C-alpha cells in the first residue's frame, strides 16, 4: 500500500520493536577535548540527531529498529543512510528532501559538564519536512515502542505529522515522548503542543529543565506527578549528577543513583539511556531494573567521545551494571 497505508512489518515479516521519529544530522566533534572551535583543526564525523542515536542504541542491544526522518539530497545525507545501515537501523523512511541541506551540528567538548552545541539547520532542517500523508501509520501503529521528540513539534509540517503518528498509536504498546527541549529550534511557545503530545504518550522522558518546560515544575517529584497528571503512565526525570527518578502511575517509584564514570563527552549519554530504556521496557523488566540498565548505558557513552558509534552492546552494559551492584 502507499506511504500512509498498511505496511506494518519489517523485512522478515515481523513488526518493529522500536520506531523513532525526528532529527538526524551529521555531528562534527573536535578530536581534541578542551579546545574551543576557533582553535580546533581536526574533527570527527559522526551520525547524530537524538532519535537517530536512540535507534542505534536500541539496535546495538539487539532490537529491531527503524527511523523516520529526512536528509538533504547531498553527500552528507548519503553518509547518514549508509551509517544507519551499518548500525542495523532500517532506514526505509529516511527520505531525501531536495531543497534543504543535511543539518550539521558542531560541539565543543569541555569535560565533565560543558558541551556547547552549534546547530546549522537553516533555512530549514529536512527532518522538519516530514508530512503526515507520507507516514506509514500502519507500521507506526504496530511497533511495540514508538519514540518521538519535542523538536518534532517545533514546526510544520513535522508537527502535524508527529501528532498524527501519536494519534495512530491505538493498539497496546509503549509511546515515548522525549521532551527534548532545544530552545534555539523553536519560534513559538511549546506549551500547547507538549500538552497534546503528553495526552497521547504513555512515557515521558526528560531532564529537569525539560520537565519544567513541559509542566512548570522543576522539583523532580513534582515534575513527575505533573507529567502523570498530563496523561502519561510513566514519568522519567533525569537529574544529572543526582541520578534518575522514575514514577509510574501505579505508584511504583525507582530512584537510581548515577554510575560513577570519567566523563569525556556527555552529549550522547541521554540517547544511550533512551535506547536502553526502550530495551528494558520491551524486556518486561521491573522499573528499577530498567532504569539501572539505562543508567549504565548512558554512563558508558559519557565516557567516550562519539555518540552513535559509542553506543554499547549488551555485554558492555551488563559488565557496568555488575560492577555497580547488579540489576
Regions found by a protein language model. Give the residues of each.
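Glycine-rich phosphate/adenosyl-contacting loop at the front of the ribokinase-like
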Residues: 1-90, 113, 262, 327
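Hydrophobic anchor at the start of a short beta-strand
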Residues: 64-65, 91, 173-175, 235
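Short beta-strand scaffold segments in enzyme catalytic cores
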Residues: 56, 104-108, 243-246
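Conserved beta-alpha-beta core of the PfkB/ribokinase-like small-molecule kinase fold
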Residues: 145-226, 234, 242-244
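A short, aliphatic-rich alpha-helical micro-motif
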Residues: 13, 137-141, 197-199
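Conserved N-terminal subdomain of the carbohydrate kinase-like
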Residues: 64-148, 319-327
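Conserved phosphate-binding/catalytic region of the ribokinase-like
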Residues: 1-19, 216-327
